[in-house]
Amino acid sequence: MKTKLYLITNDFPFGKGENSFILPELSFLVKDFEVTIISTSLSEDRTADVDAEIKVIHYDRKEKLLRKLLDCASYLGHKACYKEMLDIFRSGGNVFGKLFESVLFYEEAKRFERYLRKNRIIDDNNSCVVYSYWYTFYCLTMTEYFKNKENIKLITRAHRYDLYDEGSRFGRQPFKKYMNNRMDYIVFIAEHGRQYFYQKYGRERKKEQYQLFRLGVEKPDPIVTGRHSNKFLMASCSLAISRKRIELIIEGLSQLSNERIRWVHFGDGPELNSIKQYADKLLGNKHNIEYEWMGYVDSNEIIKFYQKSEVDLFITTSASEGCPVSLQEAMSCGIPVIGTAVAEIPYMIEGNGILLDENPTGKDVAEAISYIYDLKTEERMQMRKRSLELWDERFNLDKNADAFLNFLRRVSTEG
């Protein structure tokens, strides 16, 4: 008989944000577990099909205002909240903002716990694994609901917005210290995140309770038809938002005079129009540079483009990242890469491209592009080979998912 596993998600199988991450993992989980998905999505639009054997529960977040206010008031009566408030006041900065965020976090956790209890969603009389895909308020619910239940293993993944203080509106992650001491395992998708968390919260626990299991991407089919022009083809893929610093790519290209380059950017976002205008201003009169805005494109289509067009270089100049999937996808296609030394990117660029400083200048970007451009054929092929090797070692989805499944098997049998 399979062990029950409850997977708590932000959206999946509703909305679009998690499909590409969770669908591949599910195909491994169902091999050994009886899976129930508890989605907390606000969307009613179901966008992913799952096996008939997987039960899907769509959490109804609706609650009366009075009940919400009572939950907020109960914050003052919880022992953990006194420690939380003390930590907030010691942290300085926008204390009232941090306190406000903490109270809302607590209220959401209480509301979710009440829903689980009322509807008897989780069978806590038998051994099971409760697996949260994000390290957020569900985890506070889990630590309260299953307090002192040794037959239930509590596991969460930790990504970026749910891990780093900078991902929080007021520069502090609510209840992390409290939840840390009560989760059985925290699974990080990036080594940088694991080190960050351990230094900040983890000294009281064994390192084994902080596991690294990267997500990864699938290996594309080997379809390469050759380049479409004699120009060096460079690609980038990101949302058009300030922390992605697409303007640095533009500034770098503007300083190149002899290199014949075609740059394509995949992705849209709120700042795309202003970025386009900036590109027109700096690159519009440069006859050696072509650029094209592809807008939002499904990741499968992006990979097909990489394969068919024989992309020479992938570049990201982001100021902040987790473990960027866009970079993993480029590596899986054997593309040399340029990236900034933030978060997990230093673990992704080792002999397969150029690692820029955390805050590079346009000149730094130009020099890195020029270096890759000038590589001899043999050197470029060596970089391509190294990108594939690193992808296979660290970001191969099948290998990573299988390793994570083995971990869950072991955890589910622990006493």
Give the ranges of each region predicted by the language model.
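Conserved donor-binding/catalytic core segment of Leloir-type glycosyltransferases
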Residues: 187, 217, 221, 225-244, ...
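Short hydrophobic beta-strand element within catalytic cores of glycosyltransferases
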Residues: 313, 332-339
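Aromatic "clamp/platform" in nucleotide-sugar-dependent glycosyltransferases that forms part
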Residues: 319
